[in-house]
């Protein structure tokens, strides 16, 4: 017994030692912030200096000079600790953050039939370059046709990289640049690629990057469709703008070290707009690589558009909340793809589908639900269905946990002949169409509840699935997508996020020939276009619109373009009713839709804009509980003077208001507007208050003698007596208007942080 116990103890000690050894020596990618000005004269470049501080030159992944000051390196924890303590020039070290993707009717829906129809933006938008950070590009897509495009702008300093599956000659006057950044990803994957399809190349083997880049600036392609659905002319928002793609997302996600390197390069390459349909959790701005890179872009006049995330309708789920980026949520179009389930009890259930196969004939089939190999058979997870039960039948699957298209594949592989995917409370009444591998439709929660009850109560329930193609002029629209992430902003609650919503449900755009439309390996279909949903799809809409505004108003700053899109956004749908939320069909609010749905026609001439300088953003950062070191990490300056900081972050000259009372009853903000309309203009204010808050604006009238003139006004918000501090929020608006313009700012009120 003693010998056995001793042996067991020895094994335990050895196992523990090996675990600790592996744990302490395991290498990771770290991002290292350095005092840029400390470089000794003995080193010619910062790259040489950084390399000298590492044990091995191969440990250095990227040197950052523009979007960030420092480098990224592949180190173990001991090396990282040693590096931080070895030099006063090393200011901060943190692990490489992982971000995820936020996955042709829209021009007409947005009123872009002819590039606004009032300005000749064709020639001027030729000079606009939109940089897209995503999964790369499929250059053979017809959406990158460069017919009649003039020569590439001389300001362009970028490249089209060759790779094992990508020839630099594939770029042209439309797709002018293509680069890939994979060092962070490769290190996280053990030094190589985790998928046989991936290589060091800008080639898009996922489809997402081709979809987003063609949405932003794809050339017009006639007779486009997705397997017969959404037929028409497919085109991006800025059809004459140039596209530069930066591949930063790979099979396991998008790493901050790669994103920073791409942003660094894109700024130096000369892009005018950066579009990022990706993001992660909320982090302080000094640890948010996207926010850090975007600050440098903004300072150099580059507009940055980011997706809000797909974690809705969960409260406080919005990502990419830095005030110097445009944060974009998603709404529906006035186009739908209806499908029906004709039940054996005579009822007809309405849903949506992009199924394009031969169908299931005219004979109803038996329905089954929640019967299989495990308790999770209701979700149709892999391995959960018993083929002896579902073979030859239609399976009802609850939405959630695994991908929607995977559920259809699980049903098909188990022998099922059809599927009805029914929403639960988490997704409410939102309907997203998918191109399943078998006849399948998606239905909302209420319809799903009726369906589940029918299957349970009928001894032999049956259904016949019917597909009706494409329908236009759907009412009401837009509706806020249930998946679209919501405020309040958890990093700085005094800044309202998201900023706007744009089209993000069932969007047709270009696709990669390397993968089927479902993204599943077993999907052998290939199509030039695909229909996708997500804030990933709404973000490039705004990126393209920003490019058009940049062409129309080259003198406008990124914050002026952002203001124009925000203050002209609308909050009434095509039935003239307030915007609704697809999650539960309730009225939407600014935590879901921000300032509203973008209206590019009105944004072209907003009347007034809220401009914000770099110095004002620094005053904003100084008002946060950040150290000077943290602020320097974001603004990349040798030192920062916070003597003129805002007393409240909400004092930033933002086009919307988010009032956090906390323990106060009175909050007062001053804003400054710039006249970009006509000379001799007069605007009067209209206040739409909230039940628990009094709002007063002084002055109540703004008179402008000239274009470019600036005027200030002050708003006082008073929480009425007797209002208890609760988690509830209330909303209102402040609108400056004259016969030609309405400049609207939403206001959100909260009494505690979250």
Swiss-Prot record:
Residues 29-102 form the Inhibitor I9 domain. Residues 367-452 form the PA domain. The active site is at 134 (charge relay system), 208 (charge relay system), 536 (charge relay system). The keyword Glycoprotein applies. This is Subtilisin-like protease SBT1.8. Residues 98-604 form the Peptidase S8 domain. Residues 195-209 have a biased composition (Basic and acidic residues). SUPFAM superfamilies: Subtilisin-like. Residues 191-215 are annotated as: Disordered. It is found in: Secreted. The keyword Secreted applies. The lineage of its organism: Eukaryota, Viridiplantae, Streptophyta, Embryophyta, Tracheophyta. Coiled coil: none annotated. Residues 1-26 form the signal peptide. One of its GO terms (cellular component) is Golgi apparatus. Its EC number is 3.4.21.-. One of its GO terms (molecular function) is serine-type endopeptidase activity. Glycans are attached at residues 35, 223, 373, 641. GO terms for biological process: proteolysis. Keywords: Autocatalytic cleavage, Glycoprotein, Hydrolase, Protease, Secreted, Serine protease, Signal, Zymogen. Belongs to the peptidase S8 family. The gene is SBT1.8. InterPro entries: PA_domain (IPR003137), Peptidase_S8/S53_dom (IPR000209), Peptidase_S8/S53_dom_sf (IPR036852), Peptidase_S8_Ser-AS (IPR023828), Peptidase_S8_subtilisin-rel (IPR015500), Peptidases_S8_3 (IPR034197), S8pro/Inhibitor_I9 (IPR010259), S8pro/Inhibitor_I9_sf (IPR037045). Residues 27-102 form a propeptide.
